[in-house]
């Protein structure tokens, strides 16, 4: 019995023991690591389910699946890294709200997970791309939205790693970039969405309401009391961040798939035809083209034009011949009438 108990003890989460948080006064414990592993499992589960479902669809219908699989897999990697107590640096806190009895300096050093921000950099653009696709937003506008989203993640990464109050400058720039993306989606994209029907507009408004609440209210609040303001312990911070990340970067992208299918993939313009390759295998030896091949390379439209011109030319020729014959017959008739008149 004692051996069984020892085995169970050894089978627990030992990430903190194997990868100790050396140099950090405020860091996650085994409880925080357990929660991070839970979020990792949810993200990975969605990815594992969606990949086989994607392969059941034709290649041209898979783009919607890509937009849901990508953020889940990216965040699963980020959360596995954080749960393993890796991908972090100790940063001296600016504010002395959280304290421990073992810290040597005040404020102490807080554990900052840069792995989270790397995950955001890779995953955050996908919900924005999904919203852009609902309205058929032009490609360059989508690229602009994605670029501003990346500015948000980079600014917050720098803000989390900076000790001085200059961190709030990067924090503000990041929020500004997020606001610009939301304005772009609620103006340019929403005008395009309205043209596609009320049902598409309702889906867009619902999704954007959730995204804007989480992005412009929940995330700034969370950062302000965790990595920025050092108010919450890292364990509490992982729970706060984990819930928001699951909602915006995991659940929303997955929900987009059935809704897109309900609205109609073709209607949303999310079907991409791919022509099969003409040549497979070794490249054949090139030969000089013959004159006949140049003739056969004419486009269908030019051939049709030539045929039409030929037919028209033939018709005109026939009409001219008929007119000539009629003229000759008329002339002969007039001559006969003149001869008859002279004989009388």
From Swiss-Prot:
Pfam family for this entry, one: Bac_rhodopsin
Keywords of the record: Isopeptide bond, Membrane, Phosphoprotein, Transmembrane, Transmembrane helix, Ubl conjugation
Residue ranges with Acidic residues bias: 334-344
Compartments in which it is found: Membrane
Compositional bias per record (Basic and acidic residues), positions renumbered to this chain: 297-306
One GO location term (cellular component): endoplasmic reticulum
Keyword field contains Transferase: no
Topological region Cytoplasmic: 56-62, 141, 194-202, 260-344
Biased composition, class Basic residues, residue ranges: 307-330
Residue positions where Phosphothreonine is found in the record: 341
Topology feature Extracellular, residues: 1-34, 84-119, 163-172, 224-238
Domain of life (superkingdom): Eukaryota
UniProt membrane topology term: Multi-pass membrane protein
Membrane-spanning residues: 35-55, 63-83, 120-140, 142-162, 173-193, 203-223, 239-259
Cross-link Glycyl lysine isopeptide (Lys-Gly) (interchain with G-Cter in ubiquitin) placement: 286
CDD domains: 7tm_YRO2_fungal-like (cd15239)
Residues the record lists as Phosphoserine modifications: 293, 343
Positions of region (Disordered): 282-344
UniProt key word Lipid biosynthesis: no
Family: Belongs to the archaeal/bacterial/fungal opsin family.
Anything else known: Present with 1950 molecules/cell in log phase SD medium.
Name the UniProt record assigns to this protein: Protein YRO2
Protein encoded by which gene: YRO2
